[in-house]
């Protein structure tokens, strides 16, 4: 009996090993990496083998030791300070030139300089792999079954095609959804689908629709001009004429890091899966000292305040303005802040270099979340049903807060123009008016009421692609059409030609008949 049990256990063990696949991860930075790291951990839990490509100058990826996790480090001609510099320039450029109808061209010109620096770093990362024959040979022998990448960081798709394996994208957004629209072939009707970064909702006036239409066209132009240089790189790397967009279009699955608790209803394609909030989880107990501080709040509860990891500190004037507002509320405040201690800091506010944000938002005493509007933080607030005060600064943050405002779960204040009274009023509103808490809880219920959890859905589709060597049955035929075929311009041209020919024929016939009648009438008169 014992022998049979041991044999059965051994068979199950071997079966589990045989089911484990080999996954390759293309390097990425910032929140892009933090989200993929969650997926990696789940893949490891399910006994897959994961190899992460890591540039020697990587800023966020910290190699660790694990039996099923391998970090393949390769040299690049720059250090961590270079990536940190590009990120800093990106944030500052956006803060100083936040795009609006009046500043869009200035924003475009300044951002073009930053993106050019980003391209130089990206090319260094690409060359570090593609021109490293030893590494490429090792990857060829790795028997990988799928590659996971973020399209914001180019070349993961090139590596996948060179290895002859399918690839999957993990993506939050591209400006005005240009990548999803032109490369993924997702339709984005500007009449009711607001362009990402436009800060519009799906309820648009005529003026809003004009602005939305222009936003799409402007972002299309920016993508075409700023990313066009990659077409020649991709053609050279793959040894045939191609484009960045055409190659991106070969992705089997697009894992979109949002969901319908956040998005406005819009059309999508079957190979686009929504996995927003995949990093969210139930709250864990707080550190002892932090829990004691939270408990001193009594019935008033606490407010959590974080501007994310990208903003290291604020100007002294701005920090004092914020501290002054927070000192006037009865709630205790936990503020993630590394700068100089503000002179106006109230006794109810405590500063922390780092906070367990998810655990704090899930604490029963938390009443509000003051946030910069990053997608990860917003999803943790949605998960736990916490209303927000948005202080957006750059990238998708203003757009994210616009979504939460439209859904009644947030109030926005402008970081550049806000006064202490503005911030105080916003915090009091989300805490004291039931409207915001009710809507936050409604979004939370929607988020939790899914047939499959976001993380499980993401891993399922990765395993699906491994099992079936791709997901070609979900890929629309639009990828095989030229731009004029996609918009049916050839059909419209043909039908117009037919109509013109028919009209011309009718005119010719009428002229012929009139001529005959005229000749007959003249002949009768002569007779």
Swiss-Prot record:
Olfactory epithelium. Mainly found in the sustentacular cells and to a lesser extent in Bowman's gland cells. Also expressed in the olfactory sensory neuron nuclei. Neuronal localization within the olfactory bulb is mainly found in the deeper granular cells. GO terms for molecular function: glucuronosyltransferase activity. The chain crosses the membrane at residues 491-507. It is a single-pass type I membrane protein. Its main location: membrane. Its EC number is 2.4.1.17. It is found in: Membrane. Residues 1-20 form the signal peptide. InterPro entries: UDP-glycosyltransferase, UDP_glucos_trans, UDP_glycos_trans_CS. GO terms for cellular component: membrane. The modification N6-succinyllysine is found at residue 134. Keywords: Glycoprotein, Glycosyltransferase, Lipid metabolism, Membrane, Olfaction, Sensory transduction, Signal, Transferase, Transmembrane, Transmembrane helix. GO terms for biological process: bile acid metabolic process; response to symbiont; response to toxic substance; sensory perception of chemical stimulus; sensory perception of smell; xenobiotic metabolic process. Residues 21-490 are extracellular. Residues 508-527 are cytoplasmic. Gene3D superfamilies: Glycogen Phosphorylase B. It comes from the Eukaryota. It is an enzyme of class 2 (transferase). Belongs to the UDP-glycosyltransferase family. UDP-glucuronosyltransferase (UGT) that catalyzes phase II biotransformation reactions in which lipophilic substrates are conjugated with glucuronic acid to increase the metabolite's water solubility, thereby facilitating excretion into either the urine or bile. Essential for the elimination and detoxification of drugs, xenobiotics and endogenous compounds. Catalyzes the glucuronidation of endogenous steroid hormones such as androgens (testosterones) and estrogens (estradiol and estriol). This is UDP-glucuronosyltransferase 2A1.
């Amino acid at each position: 009996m014992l022998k049979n049990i041991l044999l059965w256990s051994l068979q199950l063990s071997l079966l589990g090993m045989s089911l484990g696949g080999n996954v390759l991860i293309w390097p990425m930075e910032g929140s892009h990496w933090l989200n993929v790291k969650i997926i990696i951990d789940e893949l490891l839990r399910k006994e897959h083998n994961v190899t992460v490509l890591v540039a020697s100058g990587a800023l966020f990826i910290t190699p660790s030791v694990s039996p099923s996790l391998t970090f393949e480090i390769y040299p690049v001609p720059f250090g961590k300070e270079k990536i940190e510099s590009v990120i800093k320039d990106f944030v500052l450029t956006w803060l100083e030139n936040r795009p609006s109808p009046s500043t869009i061209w200035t924003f475009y010109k300044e951002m073009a300089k930053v993106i050019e620096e980003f391209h130089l770093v990206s090319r260094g990362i690409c060359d570090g792999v593609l021109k490293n024959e030893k590494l490429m040979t090792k990857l060829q022998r790795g028997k990988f079954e799928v590659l996971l990448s973020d399209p914001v960081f180019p070349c993961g798709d090139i590596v996948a095609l060179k290895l002859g394996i399918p690839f999957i994208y993990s993506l939050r957004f591209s400006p005005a959804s240009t990548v999803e629209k032109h490369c993924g072939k997702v339709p984005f009707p500007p009449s009711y689908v607001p362009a990402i970064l436009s800060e519009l909702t799906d309820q648009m006036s005529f003026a809003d629709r004009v602005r939305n239409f222009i936003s799409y066209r402007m972002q299309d132009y920016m993508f075409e001009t700023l990313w066009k240089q990659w077409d020649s790189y991709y053609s050279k790397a793959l040894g045939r004429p191609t484009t960045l967009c055409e190659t991106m279009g070969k992705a089997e699955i697009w894992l979109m890091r949002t969901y319908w608790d956040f998005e406005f209803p819009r059309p999508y394609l079957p190979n686009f899966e929504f996995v927003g909030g995949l990093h969210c989880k139930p709250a864990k107990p707080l550190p002892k000292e932090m829990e004691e501080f939270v408990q001193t709040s009594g019935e008033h509860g606490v407010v959590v305040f974080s501007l994310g990891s990208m903003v290291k500190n604020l100007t002294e004037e701005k920090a004092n303005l914020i501290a002054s507002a927070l000192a006037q509320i009865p709630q205790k405040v936990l503020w993630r802040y590394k700068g100089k201690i503000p002179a106006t800091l109230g006794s109810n506010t405590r500063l922390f270099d780092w906070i367990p944000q998810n655990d704090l938002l899930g604490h029963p005493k938390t009443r509000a979340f003051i946030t910069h509007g990053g997608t990860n933080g917003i999803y943790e607030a949605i998960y736990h049903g916490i209303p927000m005060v948005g202080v957006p600064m750059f990238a998708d943050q203003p757009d994210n807060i616009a979504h939460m405002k439209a859904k009644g779960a947030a109030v926005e204040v402008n970081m550049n123009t806000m006064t202490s009274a503005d911030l105080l009023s916003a915090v009091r509103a989300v805490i004291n008016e039931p409207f915001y808490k009710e809507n936050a809880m409604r979004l939370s219920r929607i988020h939790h009421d899914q047939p499959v959890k976001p993380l499980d859905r993401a891993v399922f589709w990765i395993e699906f692609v491994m099992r079936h060597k791709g997901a070609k049955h979900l890929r629309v035929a639009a990828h095989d059409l030229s731009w004029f075929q996609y918009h049916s311009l050839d059909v419209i041209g043909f039908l117009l030609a037919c109509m013109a020919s028919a009209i011309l024929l009718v005119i010719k016939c009428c002229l012929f008949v009139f001529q005959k009648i005229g000749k007959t009438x003249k002949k009768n008169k002569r007779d």
